[in-house]
């Protein structure tokens, strides 16, 4: 059995985007190569595309710098957005009432894996 490391990960915590919106963007790039994923995210209209692209680029950089993996062979094997803490704010309403505004945060994790050149 080989002891070589073939994967690297990156996590962005407390990102001010709702997990549901982040998952919409993550579903676009899961299973794609890093270069293809970054190209998709660059032109994706969703606001969550920017933080997800940062995490993908960071995971690729971790793979290259920490483990010496070739960036051209990297594929996004895992990507998920978990819920972070929710900030609660009050919005004043009519007749002395107050409504709760929930500002949700997410923890975005991306794992990239090195695959053989011929494998798809």
UniProtKB/Swiss-Prot annotation:
One of its GO terms (molecular function) is structural constituent of ribosome. The keyword Magnesium does not apply. Keywords: Ribonucleoprotein, Ribosomal protein, RNA-binding, rRNA-binding. GO terms for cellular component: cytosolic large ribosomal subunit. Coiled coil: none annotated. It holds the Pfam family Ribosomal_L22. Signal peptide: none annotated. One of its GO terms (biological process) is translation. This protein binds specifically to 23S rRNA; its binding is stimulated by other ribosomal proteins, e.g. L4, L17, and L20. It is important during the early stages of 50S assembly. It makes multiple contacts with different domains of the 23S rRNA in the assembled 50S subunit and ribosome. Part of the 50S ribosomal subunit. Belongs to the universal ribosomal protein uL22 family. This is Large ribosomal subunit protein uL22. It comes from Corynebacterium aurimucosum (strain ATCC 700975 / DSM 44827 / CIP 107346 / CN-1) (Corynebacterium nigricans).
């Amino acid at each position: 059995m080989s002891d070589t490391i073939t994967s690297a990960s990156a996590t962005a915590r407390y990102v001010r985007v709702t997990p549901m919106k982040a998952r919409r963007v993550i579903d676009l790039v899961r299973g794609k190569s890093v270069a293809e994923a970054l190209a998709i995210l660059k032109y994706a209209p969703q606001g969550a595309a920017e933080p997800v692209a940062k995490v993908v680029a960071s995971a690729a950089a971790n793979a290259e710098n920490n483990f010496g993996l070739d960036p051209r062979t990297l594929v996004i094997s895992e990507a998920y957005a978990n819920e972070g803490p929710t900030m609660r704010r009050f919005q004043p309403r009519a007749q002395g009432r107050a409504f709760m505004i929930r500002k949700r945060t997410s923890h975005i994790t991306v794992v990239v894996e090195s695959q053989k050149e011929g494998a798809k």
